[in-house]
Amino acid sequence: MQARKITEQVYWMGAVDWDRRMFDALIPLPDGTSYNSYLVQGSEKTVLLDTVDPPMEEELLDKLEDVQKIDYLVSHHAEQDHSGTLPAVLEMFPEAQVVCTPKAKGMLVDLLKLPEDSILAVEDGDSLSLGDKNLKFLHTPWVHWPETMVSYLEEDKILFSCDFFGSHIATSDLFVNDKARVYEAAKRYFAEIMMPFRNQIAKNLDKLKDLDIQMIAPSHGQIYPDPSFIMEAYKDWVHSEPRNTVVLPYVSMHGSTRVMVDHLVASLVEQGVRVEQFNLEVTDIGKLAIALVDAGTIVLGTPTMHAGPHPYAAYCAMLANV
């Protein structure tokens, strides 16, 4: 797939991973994913925002073949699916300077062995002039690592949000054109990755409220030409009161725990309570995570195994933070 124009002098340079089915050796990817990198060409300076996961390195480098110069490499997040190809891009454009938060600087030096003098650490609210375009940087700690930030292209009113507002979808469509599909994928992404940081997400949403955002370009998934769609969804997920729903994950080795679960479910339904039931032996952990976003109650069913809960149940308790 070739570089694709977003607006005047702004291009998508990323890679679509159609075949990936697991992230972090933990998170199911039923629809694949993408690693979005963006090129902004100002009248004086050119910047590349984020890179791609190293296995997709050649796709990014091929797209950069026709780019004469890169002055800055913005690294919003030190995780390797965004930063891992920085060394290869720096080899191609050795004069480029990496731009990141002070906390990310230390991480990039440690993780990627980047020389310290190649990195410019920017403070919250700093701006970078590209000539006729300006990037403003906002620190967004714990979205979802401590060093994360976003960039706002003031003239084009584009928010480059990195993992914020992301979704794991592999598609040839650059922009969101099926809101129902993207809502499901973005909610799964929020549930699996962002939900443990709900309070921090709320604070960082508040930091964005004064920006005139006309488009959101995340580092996973499609670009939002209607940013209110995903921003309102996030506000709902972090602020809304829990619903009268019981999420009931369970594991039953010989059927006895299942008997108790069935009895409890029947009683709850009789009382008008909505129940979502998940057999941990076979369930898609992403579906369970989505259910937890809105649930007011979680009941975990487990047999005793070696004087403790079944390992599947213990794993679920860790994910659900109970």
Description of each model-found segment:
Residues 3-64, 150-153, 157-160, 257:
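Conserved beta-strand hairpin/beta-sheet module of binuclear metal-dependent hydrolase folds
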Residues 4-8, 46, 100-218, 224-225:
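Metallo-beta-lactamase
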Residues 49-51, 69-78, 98-101, 159-162, ...:
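Active-site neighborhood of phospho(di)ester-bond hydrolases with catalytic His/Asp-centered motifs
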Residues 54-99:
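Active-site metal-binding motif and surrounding structural segment of the metallo-beta-lactamase
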Residues 221-246:
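Terminal amphipathic helices with adjacent charged low-complexity linkers/tails
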Residues 262-276, 294:
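Short helix-loop-beta junction
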Residues 284-322:
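Helix-loop-strand module that forms the ligand-binding subsite of alpha/beta enzymes
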